[in-house]
Amino acid sequence: MAKKIDGYIKLQVPAGKANPSPPIGPALGQKGVNIMAFCKEFNAATASMEPGLPIPTEITVYADKSFTFIMKSPPAAFLLRKAAGIAKGSGVPNTTKVGKVTRAQLEEIVQTKNADLTAADLDAAVRTIAGTARSMGIDVEGV
């Protein structure tokens, strides 16, 4: 018989830097999960990733206080800021452009996010990421 699910927790945790401080500790503590066990498992699972990369994580908590977690790919906005070499997007994206990305850079981001995108093919996925870039005030070349 399958375990009874007690709840879900969605967090963005930096790769390799999970610790019991907020926001992780309080979120897991409310559900009665062993916080240190999660931190150790998460840090071990993200050891091969770039430290500090924000990883959206969905934690499933079961009635016996055990847990499993699913890690998604980093947010497109973070990857776009990194590719464009900027700290943050534009406050007025249609007026002020803050950086540039090429189609090759967009394709690289699509390869990273491929599992989480619902696009039918590479071109559609590139257009999706290009739209995110435009909404951040990043100029897109070649799309």
From Swiss-Prot:
GO terms for biological process: translation. SMART domains: RL11. One of its GO terms (cellular component) is cytosolic large ribosomal subunit. Keywords: Methylation, Ribonucleoprotein, Ribosomal protein, RNA-binding, rRNA-binding. Pfam families: Ribosomal_L11, Ribosomal_L11_N. HAMAP family: Ribosomal_uL11. Part of the ribosomal stalk of the 50S ribosomal subunit. Interacts with L10 and the large rRNA to form the base of the stalk. L10 forms an elongated spine to which L12 dimers bind in a sequential fashion forming a multimeric L10(L12)X complex. Belongs to the universal ribosomal protein uL11 family. The keyword Protein transport does not apply. One or more lysine residues are methylated. NCBIfam families: L11_bact. Forms part of the ribosomal stalk which helps the ribosome interact with GTP-bound translation factors. InterPro entries: Ribosomal_uL11, Ribosomal_uL11_bac-typ, Ribosomal_uL11_C, Ribosomal_uL11_C_sf, Ribosomal_uL11_CS, Ribosomal_uL11_N, Ribosomal_uL11_N_sf. This is Large ribosomal subunit protein uL11. The gene is rplK. One of its GO terms (molecular function) is structural constituent of ribosome.
